[in-house]
Amino acid sequence: MSKVKSKTKNMKTFEKYEDIVFQVIGAAMHVHHILNYGLSEPIYQEALQLELSDEGIKSEREKALHCFYKNYKLEKTYKADFVVGDDIIVEIKSRANLLPEHRAQLFNYMRLTQSPIGILINFGRSHLQSERYGYVKDTNECVLLDRYMHIKVPNSQDIL
């Protein structure tokens, strides 16, 4: 299957997560509004866990994720900051800027666990920074998504 067809097929998969991703980012915005920026990651993690719970959103903090190779479950696990629902990985940062290694960490989690959606949230700036990604299993790649969960081509503004 070509990369274009594979990505198009996955767009429908990504779109079904639009509402829950919107709710998670909204909860993070609420936490950021109350706590402001510059605190340590564990503070934001705990506050976000409480906010998600208050919103009735199922989430697990520091959940061990199993890794897969082909159809085999590996013994190696990773701990994601959050798993929302059963398959959305949320990584929290509190940095002046998101760096390529922060994205790489999320992408590794998504690829090795075959999680369809990943959200990277940065509380370290005066305005909350969030990025949405989708995992394309056929090509084993993670793609940037816009707020409507459509694949988008990143530009310099998206990664500042």
Locations of regions flagged by a protein language model:
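A short, surface-exposed helix-loop junction/capping segment
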Residues: 24-34
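Intrinsic disorder/low-complexity segments
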Residues: 1-16, 139-160
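Nucleic-acid nuclease catalytic cores
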Residues: 93-143
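Active-site metal-binding core of divalent-cation-utilizing nuclease and nuclease-like domains
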Residues: 37-87, 95, 125-138, 148-152
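Conserved beta3 VAIK motif of the Hanks protein kinase fold
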Residues: 90
